[in-house]
Amino acid sequence: MYGIEYTTVLTFLISFILLNYILKSLTIMMDFIIYRFLFIIVVLPPLLNAQNYGINLPITGSMDTAYANSTQEETFLTSTLCLYYPTEAVAEINDNSWKDTISQLFLTKGWPTGSVYFKEYTDIASFSVDPQLYCDYNVVLMKYNETLQLDMSELADLILNEWLCNPMDINLYYYQQTDEANKWISMGSSCTIKVCPLNTQTLGIGCLTTDTTTFEEVATAEKLVITDVVDGVNHKLDVTTSTCTIRNCKKLGPRENVAVIQIGGSDILDITADPTTAPQTERMMRINWKKWWQVFYTVVDYVNQIIQAMSKRSRSLNSAAFYYRV
């Protein structure tokens, strides 16, 4: 009996000593690995000359678009400003160094060289199909064109607000808008939109669901269409899907890092009448039409007042981000 107890105690002591030895061995081994790893980290960096791809990107958001006057020297920048302008401005100025001149003028207003990026677009129609707003602050210059009033106002509504959008299958389903913030947004080379409102028996109201020629045409061959119909009523839609994509969208609120400046025009575009616009003070302003040199001088002169009406955001906007906001 006593022999069994002694054997048990002896076995326990041997197990304890063996476990203690194993733990000490593991501790010594881990200390060796950790200290060797730290030694390598401390010694190697001064000997290497590799690029750190994380510090030379002054623009927040997507970097898919190359910017004409980008620089990799200003790694300390905390804010970036993108200035969007039509191609006609470049043609009129006709000066290969005009961007450098404007950049130096922005420097006098506190914007370091390399923090201002110039982005050219062909026209309002093409810009509305694929808006790309990547900077902390984005200022879009739109020269007034009487024939493009609708495109200009809808583009302003698109880029001055954030939207959550989902695909629509108009061949299988009827759609209705739930409230005033719910819109259908179409983009493409040519968008013609027709709608047929339905009653509770899914019969057309003033139209035949089997005959699209009886549908109400709300847009014809446009690049960008924001369709607003009567809330709470199902609609059958007919869209030129071969050249246009339509999405079911919800306006979430203002995109406060974007401002639109209308250049010239007797009529002032104003989207603040939209009841879904909150707050009612929008970042949309107008300056008188002058030569493009004078336009850029005016923007430089008032850039800081313009920025004060905006808020810095890191979320970028392009056609993909517009469709699927994350």
Curated annotation (Swiss-Prot):
Q: How is it modified after translation?
A: N-glycosylated. The N-terminus is blocked possibly by pyroglutamic acid.
A Gene Ontology MF term for this entry?
metal ion binding
Q: Where is the signal peptide?
A: 1-50
Where can this protein be found? Answer: Virion; Host endoplasmic reticulum lumen
Which Cys pairs are S-S linked? Answer: C82-C135, C165-C249, C191-C244, C196-C207
Span list, region GPR motif: 253-255
Which annotated residues bind Ca(2+) 1? D95, G206, T214, E216
Which keywords belong to this entry? Calcium, Capsid protein, Disulfide bond, Glycoprotein, Host endoplasmic reticulum, Host-virus interaction, Metal-binding, Outer capsid protein, Signal, T=13 icosahedral capsid protein, Virion
Q: Which residues are glycosylated?
A: N69, N145
Q: What is its main location?
A: virion
Q: Where does Ca(2+) 2 bind?
A: Q177, D228, V229, D231, D301
The answer to whether the entry has keyword Calcium is yes
Q: Which InterPro entries match?
A: VP7, VP7_1, VP7_2
Annotated region LVD motif: the residues are 237-239
Q: Which Pfam families match?
A: VP7
Please give an example of a GO cellular component term from this record.
host cell endoplasmic reticulum lumen
Annotated region described as CNP motif, given as residue ranges? 165-167
Q: How does it assemble?
A: Homotrimer; disulfide-linked. 2 Ca(2+) ions bound at each subunit interface in the trimer hold the trimer together. Interacts with the intermediate capsid protein VP6. Interacts with the outer capsid protein VP5*.
**UniProt function note:** Calcium-binding protein that interacts with rotavirus cell receptors once the initial attachment by VP4 has been achieved. Rotavirus attachment and entry into the host cell probably involves multiple sequential contacts between the outer capsid proteins VP4 and VP7, and the cell receptors. Following entry into the host cell, low intracellular or intravesicular Ca(2+) concentration probably causes the calcium-stabilized VP7 trimers to dissociate from the virion. This step is probably necessary for the membrane-disrupting entry step and the release of VP4, which is locked onto the virion by VP7.
- Family in the record: Belongs to the rotavirus VP7 family.
User: Which HAMAP family does UniProt cross-reference here?
Assistant: Rota_VP7 (MF_04130), Rota_VP7_A (MF_04131)
Miscellaneous notes: Some rotavirus strains are neuraminidase-sensitive and require sialic acid to attach to the cell surface. Some rotavirus strains are integrin-dependent. Some rotavirus strains depend on ganglioside for their entry into the host cell. Hsp70 also seems to be involved in the entry of some strains.
Protein name, UniProt field: Outer capsid glycoprotein VP7
